[in-house]
């Protein structure tokens, strides 16, 4: 077997190994089941711990929450309501996103109130200090009153008010932009005869793990936060393993930030995040209450002293919506999606999208892909265009590799002569081969470069397609309605021509009866192999023969956008290699190699011809 075939087998085997490691490290996500939801409990989030001078009286539990009035939320992108009990933002759905591809399916619900399975909500309040007690400040069970009337909408804020009956009047003004950012201004007016001290807080609470938790290694789901430039990600299982902190009365992690930051819960596509005023110290808390199975993310801001007759105000923000790249980036860079006076940028907010280990590749790859999609108007065509750009970027390295492959073919007659002279002396053969390579300035390992280069690109593109919402339900053409999902077609029903349904995704039948796109992938890999003749060794020839079809089944249930990339990449590689090798005097006999692959006994060809047409040189028989 010549060194070129050795290199090709090595590169192919390495790719196979990488895919196997990928399946081991990143197994397919567990099927989302509609199992028993977390038992609905009337207990709400645990109030923050007292400030240093505050009493340590615990917030009273709310065993029976009364029905309270609600204020509607209605914007171009959001609908829901705010509960007057605690002023909680606990009912929110995303108008622009449906649960399935069916436009008649339910829209995605992000937040839900206590009393429903897996309650998920945000609330704000004040922690008392000094002589104040928890009964003197608004908390999770305070019944607020709306000042005025009307729903919360863009440019239509709502104002809530609560009087503690002891001279303190609390006001909360909530506004929302045309995307997913809420602004919350908390005001306390001191009409008592003495100064008071208190500290504002915000809480995002989840009762139990999400029903649609994917538990996928490549995806982060759980708490995500940033404090003074450091990003932290904590999965739900790790939150439940946090050490007990006596002062918090729960398992917790407490981080003191001096300059900027944010914290909240992230899902694959959605996020709810507390954003305190930037440029000022605050405390970030991740908490788990095991008895109630409540996960919490909190922000606590600095202690405020309000003199008699004075008023204090603290503003913060809450992001609750889809992790759209353009929207998140606008909040990071400008503080708003539209030019807004006084809007504070949110440092590092783009990192709330899970870019993964290869962030230095995934970020620029997605930026270019997003731009191409904006220019072309079709995500599938954008992936194809991105593939061409990536291949052009690595063309200089690929060119050297293909030139080296062509020159290796030119050396085959000399290598055959070396094998004849060396006989069974492997040391002599190796030494003479190295001398020949050095003399002819040929690198026998250069043929591996094209495959090695595309491995990190493949992983990065997989990450981009898997986690970015811009790929969710993004169509291509024909039957490919969602490039973030596997090809829905199946050979089982002749790609939809037969009157019976395709196998259910995730079943063994679906693994066997793959779709049209994976089959095209296998054909493209098989065609790429035909640039070179099959190895003379039967075992190696069998490996080559089976490799494209093994990859076809292994990658058949990856996202169709990724399979599309691989097909186009294979076709471009085939064209590049063919043109470059011909320009250097080597003429691959593609049709001859295809014909030979269907023959039981491929015909041997003279050694001189083999160097030019891609056929393996015939071995001389000993007399």
UniProtKB/Swiss-Prot annotation:
GO molecular function: membrane insertase activity
Annotated spans, Disordered: 33-64, 601-623
Biased composition (Low complexity): 44-62, 601-617
Source species, domain of life: Bacteria
HAMAP family (UniProt xref): YidC_type1
Lineage of the organism: Bacteria, Pseudomonadati, Pseudomonadota, Alphaproteobacteria, Rhodobacterales
NCBIfam families assigned to the protein according to its UniProt record, in alphabetical order: PRK01318.1-4 (NF002353), yidC_nterm (TIGR03593), yidC_oxa1_cterm (TIGR03592)
Function, in words: Required for the insertion and/or proper folding and/or complex formation of integral membrane proteins into the membrane. Involved in integration of membrane proteins that insert both dependently and independently of the Sec translocase complex, as well as at least some lipoproteins. Aids folding of multispanning membrane proteins.
Topology class, membrane: Multi-pass membrane protein
Any Gene Ontology biological process: protein insertion into membrane
Family, as annotated: Belongs to the OXA1/ALB3/YidC family. Type 1 subfamily.
Protein's name in the database: Membrane protein insertase YidC
Organism, as annotated: Cereibacter sphaeroides (strain KD131 / KCTC 12085)
Subunit structure: Interacts with the Sec translocase complex via SecD. Specifically interacts with transmembrane segments of nascent integral membrane proteins during membrane integration.
Pfam families registered for this protein in UniProt: 60KD_IMP (PF02096), YidC_periplas (PF14849)
Keywords from the UniProt entry: Cell inner membrane, Cell membrane, Chaperone, Membrane, Protein transport, Transmembrane, Transmembrane helix, Transport
């Amino acid at each position: 077997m010549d060194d070129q075939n050795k290199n090709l087998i090595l590169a192919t085997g390495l790719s196979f190994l990488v895919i196997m490691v990928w399946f081991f490290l990143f197994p397919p996500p567990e099927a989302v089941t509609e199992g028993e939801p977390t038992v609905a409990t009337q207990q709400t989030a645990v109030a923050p711990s007292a400030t240093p001078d505050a009493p340590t009286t615990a917030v009273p539990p709310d065993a029976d929450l009364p029905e309270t009035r609600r204020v509607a939320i209605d914007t171009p992108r959001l609908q829901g309501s705010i509960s007057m009990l605690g002023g909680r933002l606990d009912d929110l759905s995303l108008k622009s996103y449906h649960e399935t591809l069916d436009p008649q399916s339910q829209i995605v619900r992000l937040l839900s109130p206590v009393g429903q399975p897996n309650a998920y909500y945000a609330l704000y309040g004040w922690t008392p200090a000094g002589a104040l007690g928890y009964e003197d400040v608004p908390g999770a069970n305070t019944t607020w009153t709306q000042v005025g009337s009307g729903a919360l909408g863009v440019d239509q804020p709502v104002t809530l008010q609560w009087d503690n009956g002891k001279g303190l009047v609390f006001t909360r003004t909530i506004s929302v932009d045309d995307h997913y950012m809420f602004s919350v201004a908390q005001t306390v007016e001191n009409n008592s005869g003495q100064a008071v001290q208190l500290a504002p807080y915000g809480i995002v609470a989840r009762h139990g793990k999400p029903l649609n938790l994917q538990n996928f290694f490549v995806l982060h789901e759980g708490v995500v936060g940033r404090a003074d430039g450091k990003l932290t990600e904590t999965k739900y299982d790790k939150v439940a393993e946090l050490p007990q902190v006596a002062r918090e009365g729960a398992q917790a992690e407490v981080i003191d930030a001096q300059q900027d930051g944010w914290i909240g819960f992230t899902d694959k596509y959605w996020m709810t995040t507390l954003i305190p005023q930037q440029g000022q110290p605050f405390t970030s808390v991740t908490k788990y209450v095991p008895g109630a199975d409540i996960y919490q993310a909190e922000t606590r801001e600095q202690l405020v002293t309000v003199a008699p007759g004075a008023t204090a105000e603290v503003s913060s923000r809450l992001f609750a919506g889809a992790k759209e790249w353009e929207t998140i980036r606008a909040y990071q860079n400008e503080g708003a999606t539209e030019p807004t006076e006084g809007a504070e940028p949110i440092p590092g907010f783009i990192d709330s999208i899970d870019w993964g280990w290869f962030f230095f590749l995934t970020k620029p790859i997605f930026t270019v892909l997003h731009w191409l999609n904006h220019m072309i108007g079709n995500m599938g065509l954008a992936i194809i265009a991105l593939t061409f750009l990536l291949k052009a970027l690595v063309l200089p390295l690929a060119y050297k590799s293909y030139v080296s492959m062509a020159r290796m073919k030119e050396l085959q007659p000399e290598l055959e002569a070396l094998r004849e002279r060396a006989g069974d002396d492997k040391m002599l053969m190796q030494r003479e081969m190295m001398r020949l390579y050095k003399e002819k300035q040929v690198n026998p390992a250069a043929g591996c470069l094209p495959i090695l280069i595309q491995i990190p690109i493949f992983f990065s593109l997989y990450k981009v397609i898997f986690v970015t919402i811009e790929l969710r339900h993004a169509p291509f053409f024909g039957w490919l309605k969602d490039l973030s999902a596997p090809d829905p077609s199946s050979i089982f029903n002749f790609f939809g021509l037969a009157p019976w349904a395709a196998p259910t995704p995730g079943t063994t039948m679906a693994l066997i009866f793959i779709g049209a796109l994976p089959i095209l992938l296998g054909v493209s890999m098989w065609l790429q192999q035909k640039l070179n003749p099959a190895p003379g060794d039967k075992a190696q020839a069998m490996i080559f023969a089976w490799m494209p079809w093994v990859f076809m089944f292994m990658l058949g249930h990856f996202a169709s956008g990724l399979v599309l990339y691989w097909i186009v990449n294979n076709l471009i590689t085939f064209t590049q290699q063919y043109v470059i090798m011909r320009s250097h005097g080597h003429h691959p006999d593609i049709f001859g190699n295809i014909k030979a692959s269907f023959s039981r006994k491929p015909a041997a060809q003279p050694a001189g011809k083999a160097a030019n047409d891609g056929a393996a040189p015939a071995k001389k028989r000993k007399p």
